[in-house]
Swiss-Prot record:
<keyword id="KW-0805">Transcription regulation</keyword>
<comment type="function">
    <text>Binds to the consensus sequence 5'-AGAGTG-3' and has transcriptional activator activity. May have a tumor-suppressor function. May play a role in apoptosis.</text>
</comment>
<feature type="region of interest" description="Disordered">
    <location>
        <begin position="478"/>
        <end position="497"/>
    </location>
</feature>
<keyword id="KW-0238">DNA-binding</keyword>
<keyword id="KW-0539">Nucleus</keyword>
<protein>
    <recommendedName>
        <fullName>Cysteine/serine-rich nuclear protein 1</fullName>
    </recommendedName>
</protein>
<dbReference type="InterPro" id="IPR023260">
    <property type="entry name" value="Cys/Ser-rich_nuc_prot"/>
</dbReference>
<keyword id="KW-0010">Activator</keyword>
<dbReference type="Pfam" id="PF16019">
    <property type="entry name" value="CSRNP_N"/>
</dbReference>
<feature type="compositionally biased region" description="Low complexity">
    <location>
        <begin position="351"/>
        <end position="372"/>
    </location>
</feature>
<dbReference type="GO" id="GO:0043565">
    <property type="term" value="F:sequence-specific DNA binding"/>
</dbReference>
<feature type="region of interest" description="Disordered">
    <location>
        <begin position="313"/>
        <end position="392"/>
    </location>
</feature>
<comment type="similarity">
    <text>Belongs to the AXUD1 family.</text>
</comment>
<feature type="region of interest" description="Disordered">
    <location>
        <begin position="1"/>
        <end position="66"/>
    </location>
</feature>
<keyword id="KW-0053">Apoptosis</keyword>
<dbReference type="InterPro" id="IPR031972">
    <property type="entry name" value="CSRNP_N"/>
</dbReference>
<dbReference type="GO" id="GO:0005634">
    <property type="term" value="C:nucleus"/>
</dbReference>
Length: 593
């Protein structure tokens, strides 16, 4: 095919060159000669076939191939298909009428005579669409009238039988046709108004007596009685399915095995009487699983409902993409600002690192200045007019969310429970453990004694050494910041530094293990606590509302999401034995190094 098309293109080029050379219009440009390709090909075809009359009457040299009025025929290589109408219009309907006969094809539920039609039609009639609609309505009205007559006849027979009068003395009409049409017109109007006209449009089974009457009315004189016995055998074979084995199948006597089919079980002992354990049919066994069918049905309905919901959601989402957000959608956006952590010059180089290395800040914890006298809290806390900004750090933004809806109720339910993060969302943990105030932890603990401070410790504190916690806390305790404690005057700086040095050698997680946000599990807790009890004796000073170490994954997740868990359980045995609130003891005791 490609060679044939190429040959046609070559012929077109040769014809174009011959026609262009014989043209007498020397003023035609190259563009005009290129446009004359299609007319020249038409001229060559017209001269060969002699089918174009106007082109034969005009001499070739006098034609203007570049004229816009010149005829441009369609290409012989590419022709557009002629559009055909896609709709089908019916002009009329032809109805063929067939006489009734005994069918011998169907199997009715009762009786022995079946209805059929003759192989040749007896009449033919053509209707227009409007006429056929009217004929259908008339036929339905007639069927409904006949049904009403049958119902009326049955009602009269029931009344006579209830009264005890014999049918011969009652004088009832012998057939439906004997009932007058005028007597059922009122009932017919009521039935049409009630919507019963649509009922007659569906095929209804006729009883055996009605079928015999229709056959006799159609001219059938003799009804074959042999069909009745054949139909009875067919119905019996359909009802008699499955084997008649009693719980145990014998392949030699089982009807299913002899027929080469599987035993079937829809429910107990139907259609086959064998059980699952006693079936020995070599062809196998098929059981109806009702649970599987119901599960498939439920899954299908669920899938269809999900598809409908997804389609409706896409329909609702499509017009909403180009529209501006509504005021209700804007109200869903949180209006509170996210807390911005301090810069590295305030926290130090190790404040936000993730290498988990220890950084000792005990030497610089005492060189800090106290806050303003008018500020009752820690000087590092932001004032009332502080507006926190938005930081790109996603972890800081996640940890800065507050949980005001849960914390208030938990504080009212139990005293000393783990508080919410509302009181901790306005400052950074470095303000607690920072080096600017020696009594920062103690003063903050005293001012926030109503709730636990451990739930608000963020992830940035994992890199701080335990010495800053003890040093700041002990020095604050000497100033009387912690209520209910006292420092003996005989305690000097040397003992304090010795305690600090002995505690600074341990891992920071040993003290943070008691906190819910840094719980590493009961195994790590028991191992570390047993090691630390042999070498160090922790100071006795009360801390408000410490939470027991819970699950590591749940505590870490709750610390990220900002949800606080109530301290409903008792403290760790280590905390119970070391931190006692009942007996006031000295804050510090000499520890052997």
């Amino acid at each position: 095919m490609t060679g044939l098309l190429k040959r046609k293109f070559d012929q077109l080029d040769e014809d174009n060159s011959s026609v262009s050379s014989s043209s007498s219009s020397s003023s035609s440009s190259s563009g005009c000669q290129s446009l004359s390709c299609s007319p020249s090909s038409s001229v060559s075809r017209a001269s060969d076939s002699e089918e174009e009359g106007p082109w034969d009457q005009m001499p070739l040299p006098d034609r203007d191939f570049c004229s816009p009025r010149s005829f441009t025929p369609l290409s012989i290589l590419k022709r557009a298909r002629r559009e055909r109408p896609g709709r089908v219009a019916f002009d009329g309907i032809t109805v063929f009428y067939f006489p009734r006969c005994q069918g011998f094809t169907s199997v009715p539920s009762r009786g022995g005579c079946t209805l059929g039609m003759a192989p040749r039609h007896s009449a033919c009639r053509r209707f227009s669409l409007a006429e056929f609609a009217q004929e259908q309505a008339r036929a339905r009205h007639e069927k409904l009238r006949q049904r009403l007559k049958e119902e009326k006849l049955e009602m009269l027979q029931w009344k006579l039988s209830a009264a005890g009068a014999p049918k011969a003395e009652a004088g009832l009409p012998p057939a439906v046709d004997a009932i007058d049409d005028a007597s059922v017109e009122e009932d017919l109007a009521v039935a049409v108004a009630g919507g019963r006209l649509e009922e007659v449009s569906f095929l209804q089974p006729y009883p055996a007596r009605r079928r015999r009457a229709l056959l006799r009315a159609s001219g059938v004189r003799r009804i074959d009685r042999e069909e009745k016995r054949e139909l009875q055998a067919l119905r019996q074979s359909r009802e008699d399915c499955g084997c008649h084995c009693d719980r145990i199948c014998d392949p030699e006597t089982c009807s299913c095995s002899l027929a080469g089919i599987k035993c079937q079980m829809d429910h107990t002992a139907f259609p086959c009487g064998c059980c699952r354990e006693g079936c020995e049919n070599p062809m196998g066994r098929v059981e109806f699983n009702q649970a599987r069918v119901q599960t498939h049905f439920i899954h299908t309905l669920t899938r269809l409902q999900l598809e409908q919901e997804a389609e409706s959601f896409r329909e609702l989402e499509a017009p909403a993409q180009g529209s501006p957000p509504s005021p209700g959608e804007e109200a869903l956006v949180p209006t509170f600002p996210l807390a911005k952590p301090p810069m590295n010059n305030e926290l130090g180089d190790n404040s936000c690192s993730s290498d988990m290395t220890d950084s000792s800040t005990a030497s610089s914890s005492a060189s800090g200045t106290s806050g303003a006298p008018d500020c009752p809290t820690h000087p590092g806390l932001p004032g009332p007019g502080f507006q926190p900004g938005v930081d790109d750090d996603s972890l800081a933004r996640i940890l800065s969310f507050s949980d005001s809806d849960f914390g208030g109720e938990e504080e009212e339910e139990e005293e000393g429970s783990v508080g919410n993060l509302d009181n901790l969302s306005c400052f950074h943990p470095a303000d607690i453990f920072g080096t600017s105030d020696p009594g920062g932890l103690a003063s903050w603990t005293h001012s926030y004694s109503g709730c636990s401070f451990t739930s608000g410790i963020l992830d940035e504190n994992a890199n701080l050494d335990a010495s800053c916690f003890l040093n700041g806390g002990l020095e604050g305790s000497r100033e009387g910041s912690l209520p209910g404690t006292s420092v003996p005057p005989s305690m000097d700086a040397g003992q304090s530094s010795s305690v600090d040095l002995s505690l600074s050698s341990c891992d920071s997680f040993e003290l943070l293990q008691a906190l819910p946000d840094y719980s590493l599990g009961p195994h790590y807790t028991s191992q570390k606590v047993s090691d630390s009890l042999d070498n160090i004796e922790a100071p006795h000073f009360p801390l408000p509302g410490l939470s027991p170490p819970g699950d590591a994954s749940s505590c870490f997740l709750e610390s990220l999401m900002g949800f606080s868990e109530p301290a409903a359980e008792a403290l760790d045995p280590f905390i119970d034995s070391q931190f006692e609130d009942t007996v006031p003891a000295s804050l510090m005791e000499p520890v052997p190094v």
